[in-house]
Curated annotation (Swiss-Prot):
Family listed: Belongs to the UPF0637 family.
Protein name per its UniProtKB record: UPF0637 protein BCG9842_B1177
Pfam families, alphabetized: DUF1054
Family annotation (InterPro entries): UPF0637, UPF0637_domain_sf
SUPFAM superfamilies: YktB/PF0168-like (SSF142913)
Length: 208
């Protein structure tokens, strides 16, 4: 399958004014690429976890006034949804693309997962690549670079996942529009795989 990488014009959809207008641009320019990525990487994750993964392209159906500032495809083991489960994401903000694994506030497994992560805290600190980033709110683009974190910083983020009702924790990479301009399709797909690979052990900890 030939999958086109995201281009600089794809990031520009988030400058389109108006909910209907921006959603039209997203559906035309971004969703076909997310669908193709969904098919390919649902299969990849199923193969590497021995579980059946399904993909879910964000519909932004609850939005009535404000247009979305990001969009994505998510991967989970539930055919009906992903928010209630540990899941993977590939998506775009206006400033960058992202590839994540994580748990968001709807997930009821947060406490158990946080305890599992804390038991393997030193492994997480060592094995997560230095150029990966951590997010504590999927609705905001701000992140913390892994190599800048002390073990205590990571511990606090994980503990927050267990103790704060609305807490979230996601980890992965950001790719700038400039980086995409130098990437071939094959390099982009390889980048997704090389990002998911060190995140698979975190998924396994969620399901031990």
């Amino acid at each position: 399958m030939t999958i086109q990488t995201f281009k600089s014009t794809d990031f520009d959809v988030f400058t389109v004014d108006g909910l209907e207008e921006r959603m039209s641009a997203i559906k035309t320019n971004i969703h076909p690429k997310l669908e193709a990525l969904g098919e390919q990487f649902a299969e990849y994750l199923s193969k590497h976890t021995d579980e059946n993964f399904f993909y879910h392209v964000a519909k932004h159906a609850r939005r009535k006034v404000n247009p979305p500032n990001d969009t994505w495809v998510a991967f989970s083991t539930n055919k009906r949804g992903y928010k209630m489960l540990p899941h993977f994401q590939i998506g775009l903000w206006g400033t960058h693309a992202f590839i994540y694994f994580g748990l968001i506030y709807e997930c009821p497994q947060k406490v158990e997962t946080a305890h599992a992560f804390l038991e393997h805290l030193n492994d997480l600190k060592t094995n997560i690549p230095n150029d990966f980033v951590w997010s504590i709110d999927h609705t905001k683009p701000s992140v913390k670079l892994h190599k800048t974190l002390e073990t205590e910083d990571l511990q606090k983020m994980i503990e927050r996942l267990a103790t704060v009702k609305k807490a979230e924790l996601l980890v992965g990479i950001h790719i700038s529009p400039e980086e995409f301009s130098a990437m071939t399709n094959e390099q982009f797909l390889a980048k997704i795989e090389s990002t998911m690979q060190p995140l698979l052990p975190l998924y396994a900890l969620c399901n031990r």
